[in-house]
């Protein structure tokens, strides 16, 4: 049975008819300040190491590149991504014959920006809502404790602020806390949450959610799912079943599969990402808890590893601290405020 945590007929903002990115709804200046603050520890750690690596050196040589490789790996950029960046810089050094250490920061900046662009990251991120996709269905995956429910709540807030009618689905039926937390977020944001009894079939919850959303004329549906990795086959089967059942209501659902990762866990986030990519087709990433950590390099490495764009980053506890990921702004905050 479909149960709404709050009144599904609650008033919502008028639905806007144009397809918009959420970056337009926020003050860019405020976003930039939040981003700068969130990446401050990453920047300080990274550039402190970089300054020491080139101390007393006038040109980029093998020793400098070896030091840079170590810096990137210890900054949680990831081994594969680090190798790619070093190879690109080596090619430039070989081509230009002489590259001064004073140029290294700009070269590194350009290569990181290029890598992010190649993985589909752009300057106007976040989810856009095509007019012919209604409701737009987002299935959210990720292990427990990464900020999945919080991300869903903040994402629902942003959609609602943009004038969209949102319905949430509590398909993580294995943890009572997960359903309770989602209902709390639904009440806080002012959007309905569809749930069933604990232990119910998650696919059944997803079916009810989409049916309810269609009946209400909702613009967006966000489905929470269980965050279990101890049984990869079971996870894969469960997510596949949810997708198949949703397609009985919305034939091309889900339109996005958003993987939420905890950026502060560094290398653990890479392993989680690998497991979920094996279990389902991830189309977008949200990297949370970047504020207060020096592990911001994980954003670069995971996007490059998976060849999946980062759509959102979490930079704090406030509703607006879930920011649409903007490649240029991210690189600017990491390296300074010059043009990327």
Q: Predicted segments — roles?
A:
Residues 110-113, 119-340:
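P-loop/Walker A NTP-binding module and the surrounding RecA-like catalytic core of P-loop NTPases
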């Amino acid at each position: 049975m479909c149960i709404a945590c709050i009144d599904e007929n609650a008033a919502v903002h008028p639905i806007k008819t144009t397809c918009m990115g959420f970056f337009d709804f926020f003050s860019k200046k405020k976003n930039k300040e939040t981003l700068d603050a969130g990446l401050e520890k990453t920047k300080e750690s990274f550039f402190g190491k970089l300054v020491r690596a080139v101390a007393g050196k006038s040109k980029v040589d093998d020793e400098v590149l070896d030091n840079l490789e170590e810096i990137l790996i210890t900054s949680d950029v990831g081994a594969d991504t680090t190798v790619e960046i070093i190879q690109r810089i080596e090619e430039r050094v070989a081509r230009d014959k002489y590259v001064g250490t004073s140029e290294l920061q700009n070269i590194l900046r350009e290569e990181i920006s290029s890598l992010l662009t190649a993985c589909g990251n752009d300057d106007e991120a976040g989810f856009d809502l095509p007019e012919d996709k209604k409701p737009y269905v987002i299935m959210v995956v990720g292990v427990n404790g990464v900020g999945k429910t919080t991300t869903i709540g903040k994402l629902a807030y942003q959609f609602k602020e943009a004038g969209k009618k949102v319905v949430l689905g509590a398909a993580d039926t294995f943890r009572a806390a997960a359903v309770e937390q989602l209902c709390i977020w639904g009440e806080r944001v002012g959007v309905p949450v569809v749930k069933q009894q604990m232990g119910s079939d998650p696919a059944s919850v997803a079916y009810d959610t989409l049916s309810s959303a269609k009946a209400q004329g909702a613009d967006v549906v966000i489905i929470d799912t269980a965050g279990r990795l101890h049984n990869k086959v079971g996870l894969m089967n469960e997510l596949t079943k949810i997708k198949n059942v949703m397609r009985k209501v919305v034939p091309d659902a889900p339109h996005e599969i958003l993987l939420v990762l905890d950026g502060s866990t560094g290398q653990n986030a890479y392993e989680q990402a690998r497991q979920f990519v094996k279990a389902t087709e991830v189309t977008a990433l949200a990297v949370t808890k970047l504020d207060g950590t020096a592990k911001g390099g994980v954003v670069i490495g995971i996007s490059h590893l998976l060849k999946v764009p980062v759509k959102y980053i979490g930079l704090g506890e406030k509703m607006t601290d879930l920011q649409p990921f903007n490649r240029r702004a991210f690189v600017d905050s990491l390296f300074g405020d010059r043009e990327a």
